[in-house]
Design a protein with these regions (language model features):
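Membrane-helix interface and helix-disruption motif detector
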Residues: 24-36, 59, 83-89, 107-114
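Canonical alpha-helical transmembrane segments
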Residues: 39-63, 67
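Short hydrophobic, aromatic-rich alpha-helical segments embedded in or entering the lipid bilayer
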Residues: 87-105
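Alpha-helical transmembrane segments and their helix-start/interface "positive-inside/aromatic belt" motifs
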Residues: 1-7, 60-70
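Transmembrane alpha-helical segments in integral membrane proteins
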Residues: 46-52, 118-142
Length: 144
């Protein structure tokens, strides 16, 4: 179970990058553009929710730790300066943040002193979606 959670967590930056590249294909026009971006971000958060939902149990309290090993390591690697010089490599490393790039514009390449807060914000949002899925999964498994 731990290995499955680590592998599913390792897929999340790749899925985030895929959603980011899909967002680049959306024409930049009006409310339809914003709705499509919101739907794509919601689909990305649904991935975290359903992974937690299907792996939730009262015995395994550390599911989120195993699931977020790879995204957190990539978050730390993102602070290496030379990675930011190469846009594609920086996007791969910040894959969990990528779907939120158009929602929060200064997220991937900010230049201010609050870089850490803005960079960890998407990871926190994904963690909250994971925890909600875990709680809902435990609730439904108790009812059955």
């Amino acid at each position: 179970m731990k290995l499955k959670l680590i592998l599913l967590g390792s897929l999340s930056p790749l899925i985030g990058l895929l959603i980011f590249f899909l967002q680049l294909q959306v024409p930049f026009h009006g409310i339809k553009y914003l709705v499509i971006l919101a739907i794509m971000s919601a689909v990305f958060l649904a991935y975290f929710f359903f992974c937690a939902f299907f792996f939730s149990s009262k015995q395994h309290k550390k599911n989120s730790l195993y699931f977020f090993v790879t995204p957190f390591i990539l978050f730390l690697v993102n602070f290496i300066g030379w990675i930011q010089k190469y846009v594609v490599l920086a996007l791969i490393v910040s894959g969990v943040s990528a779907p939120f790039h158009y929602v929060l514009p200064d997220l991937i390449f900010p230049g201010d002193k609050y870089y850490l807060i803005m960079s960890i914000f998407p990871l926190v949002i994904c963690w909250i979606a994971f925890k909600i899925g875990e709680r809902v999964g435990i609730y439904f498994k108790e009812r059955i």
